[in-house]
């Protein structure tokens, strides 16, 4: 305590006018590490109370009805109150604004005790606080009967952290925070602050660099181009999906139908003026549309906050903030709620592998690497121009694991599709020799990322029974979708990129050349049971000059539509869950453009509406027939009838269900030549009926098929004791089932 240089005046109060001490000078300069040492109420040995406040915008300040004195040359005001002076635990200060002259009232943040619990800080330091979003970030709460906002942020090894915002003129000297020791966490409770305020953190790094950052744990942010965090509304959302959540705990996803409609919410449909649909508008239009098509799930491209529309959400700046583009967090909750009440699950694309270099967000958060690995050979994706999380740092891993749980807990999301898993697993991913560092064993496997993925999957499955995790993993890494205890990564499912690439490469060829590439269709059965596969026709296949699915197809106009119908029939005949990106359901000609909307006008053309009708019926058949979904991940559900007819480019197969379920026989003709009297063996005697024909007139086809029951002859064929002769439509597929 510095020495008083002005004696106590007459009366019951004391005024102090002092030359600024070193602590006050550091406070004035924004360099003080511990503002609680200087500000607030300090009881003296004789029982007097020294009250200090730092108010750069104030002309005058009063406490307990007594004028405080400005410390010369500073914006610090103080008053020494004699022993026995009645003073609230959190005294109310009255101050006069320099600019307006108006008098205002506030309570000093520096009279409040620390708010974060030691156990919270310990668990966070251990990387095991899986509800950390309830601790860090901004939260409106009441402390000692005073309502305000508690801010908390992790920023280790820095000189100062301050809350700046629209409530303090973005002045980093106004609200410096309290450091919670070795945890590296800083906190401050600001009385009177309500939801809706804009804020950031100003950080003074250990080398003197000053950066201003959005809150990594912000649960709400302002619409781009703004980059500020927003104090969130704490009022709870009234969910109406309890029945869905209860049923989800019993959801047997391995044996249930699962067809996913992948959606970019910013470009599915737009208003007449080109602006985004809100979640409320999407609720009214998207949900009934998807339900009518028969899909079981909607998968949303990333909806966490991101600064750049053209990143599609894959370069995230606010991992805990639902993007402001489509409304409030509660609007997103209402969308998910409505999906559940309509019988639709909701999956979310999640991006834990990398983050952008934008200087307002996570990159060099303390003026130097914090969330990213410090060595660019591990900390940077050169191809994407992004940074890689330091998965080996407890607090960073905790940030990400808790974020996965956050979306499932706070938004009732039913599962996560994890983006770019391969880039996380390999230290040399897309790196040349000398541009990467091996692990401690000299290998290229990222052991820290593997541990992180284990932890994410284990916690998701333990805390949210029935929720699923899906890996976008493009290599042959083994056991991605196998349990951790069996040596796997613990994902529920994995995208089958091999099936997708081979199938599209095959079907883009002119039919006359397909017989030479027949193995591209059959090869997937060599590994089909090694993972729990999803068959994706995703957004990645209809961008960057790859063309839309319809525009990839060879031939004249009729053949292009027929080929696309055949592609979808092959997807639903093949074992594995299904995924299709929006626009594919009606055969959009253009590539996907995130800056516009789908070409809805095409539904006025019969061929396009026929594609949609086919997918509606494929989803119905897939859902209703256990043979087409029950053994999606088990070889008991699939058998080739004939996979060797390369000369005619025909495949025939049978899908089997559980005991008692009728089998489904599928034939696919990948040439424009009709096949009459085409004989195949069948697994059962008795009549067979055609239950779906991709060449039906209802789908825009030529209507060639098998309108009458097909009766087997006692002619052994292809390992079966009986066989039938069928008519195969050109570039068409037929699904047969034992007649009732």
Swiss-Prot record:
Instruction: Name a GO CC annotation attached to this entry.
Output: cytosol
Q: Which residues form the active site?
A: 419 (nucleophile), 472 (proton donor)
- What domain of life is recorded for the organism? Bacteria
Pathway in which the depicted protein is active? Glycan biosynthesis; glycogen biosynthesis
Q: Top EC class per UniProt?
A: transferase
* Family in the record: Belongs to the glycosyl hydrolase 13 family. GlgB subfamily.
The entry's protein name is 1,4-alpha-glucan branching enzyme GlgB
Which organism is this entry from? Thiobacillus denitrificans (strain ATCC 25259 / T1)
Its organism's taxonomic lineage begins at: Bacteria, Pseudomonadati, Pseudomonadota, Betaproteobacteria, Nitrosomonadales
């Amino acid at each position: 305590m510095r020495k008083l240089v002005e004696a106590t005046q007459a009366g019951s109060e004391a005024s102090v006018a002092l030359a600024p001490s070193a602590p006050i000078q550091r406070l004035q300069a924004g360099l003080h590490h511990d503002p609680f040492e200087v500000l607030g109420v300090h009881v003296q040995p004789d029982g007097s109370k020294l009250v200090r406040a730092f108010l750069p915008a104030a002309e005058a300040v009063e406490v307990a009805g007594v004028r405080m004195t400005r410390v010369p040359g500073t914006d610090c005001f103080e008053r020494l109150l004699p022993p026995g002076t009645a003073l609230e635990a959190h005294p109310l200060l009255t101050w006069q604004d320099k600019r307006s002259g108006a008098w205002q009232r506030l309570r000093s943040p520096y009279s409040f005790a620390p708010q974060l619990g030691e156990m919270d800080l310990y668990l966070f330091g251990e990387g095991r606080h899986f509800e950390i979003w309830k601790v860090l970030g901004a939260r409106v709460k009441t402390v000692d009967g005073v309502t305000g906002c508690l801010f908390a942020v992790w920023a280790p090894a820095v000189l100062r952290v301050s809350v700046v915002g629209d409530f303090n003129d973005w002045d980093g000297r106004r609200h410096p925070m309290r450091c919670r020791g070795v945890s590296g966490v800083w906190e401050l409770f600001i009385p009177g602050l309500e939801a809706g305020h804009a804020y950031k953190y100003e950080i003074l790094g250990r080398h003197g660099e000053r950066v201003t950052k959005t809150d990594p744990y912000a649960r709400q942010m302002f619409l781009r181009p703004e980059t500020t965090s927003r104090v969130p509304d704490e009022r709870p959302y009234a969910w109406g999906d309890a029945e869905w959540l209860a049923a989800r705990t019993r959801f047997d996803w391995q044996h249930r139908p699962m067809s996913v409609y992948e959606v970019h919410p910013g470009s599915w449909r737009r208003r007449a003026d080109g602006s985004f649909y809100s979640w409320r508008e999407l609720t009214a239009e998207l949900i009934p549309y998807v339900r009518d098509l028969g899909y079981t799930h909607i998968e949303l491209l990333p909806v966490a906050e991101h600064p750049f529309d053209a990143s599609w959400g894959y370069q995230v700046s606010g991992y805990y903030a639902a993007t402001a583009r489509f409304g409030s967090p509660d609007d997103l909750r209402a969308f998910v709620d409505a999906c559940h009440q309509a019988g639709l699950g909701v999956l979310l694309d999640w991006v834990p592998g990398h983050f952008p270099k934008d200087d307002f967000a996570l990159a060099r958060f303390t003026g130097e690497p914090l969330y990213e690995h410090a060595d660019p050979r591990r900390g940077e994706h050169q191809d994407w121009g992004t940074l890689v999380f330091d998965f080996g740092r407890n607090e960073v891993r905790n940030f990400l694991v808790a974020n996965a749980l956050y979306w499932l807990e706070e938004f009732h999301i039913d599962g996560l599709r994890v983006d770019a898993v391969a880039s996380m697993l390999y230290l040399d991913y897309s790196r040349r020799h000398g541009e990467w560092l091996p692990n401690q064993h000299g290998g290229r496997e990222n052991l820290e990322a593997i541990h992180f993925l284990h932890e994410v999957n284990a916690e998701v499955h333990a805390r949210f029974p029935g929720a699923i995790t899906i890996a976008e993993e493009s290599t042959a890494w083994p056991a991605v979708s196998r349990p951790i205890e069996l040596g796997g990564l613990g994902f529920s499912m994995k995208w089958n990129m091999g099936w997708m690439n081979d199938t599209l490469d095959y079907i883009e060829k002119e039919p006359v050349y397909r017989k030479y590439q027949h193995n591209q269709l059959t090869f997937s059965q060599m590994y089909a049971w090694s993972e729990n596969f999803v068959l994706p026709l995703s957004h990645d296949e209809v961008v960057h000059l790859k063309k839309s699915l319809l525009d990839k197809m060879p031939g004249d106009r009729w053949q292009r539509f027929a080929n696309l119908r055949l592609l979808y029939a092959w997807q639903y005949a093949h074992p594995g869950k299904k995924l299709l990106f929006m626009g594919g359901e009606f055969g959009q000609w253009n590539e996907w453009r995130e800056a516009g909307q789908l070409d809805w006008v095409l539904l006025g053309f019969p061929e396009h509406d026929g594609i949609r009708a086919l997918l509606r019926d494929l989803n119905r058949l897939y859902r209703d027939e256990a043979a087409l979904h029950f053994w999606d991940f088990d070889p008991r559900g699939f058998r080739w009838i004939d996979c060797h007819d390369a000369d005619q480019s025909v495949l025939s197969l049978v899908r089997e269900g559980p005991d008692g379920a009728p089998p489904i026989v599928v034939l696919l003709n990948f040439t424009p030549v009709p096949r009459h009297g085409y004989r195949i063996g069948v697994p059962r005697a008795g009549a067979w009926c055609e239950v779906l024909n991709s060449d039906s007139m209802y789908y825009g086809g030529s209507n060639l098929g098998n309108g009458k029951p097909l009766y087997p002859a006692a002619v052994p064929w292809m390992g079966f004791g009986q066989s039938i002769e069928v008519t195969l439509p050109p570039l068409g597929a037929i699904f047969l089932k034992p007649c009732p």
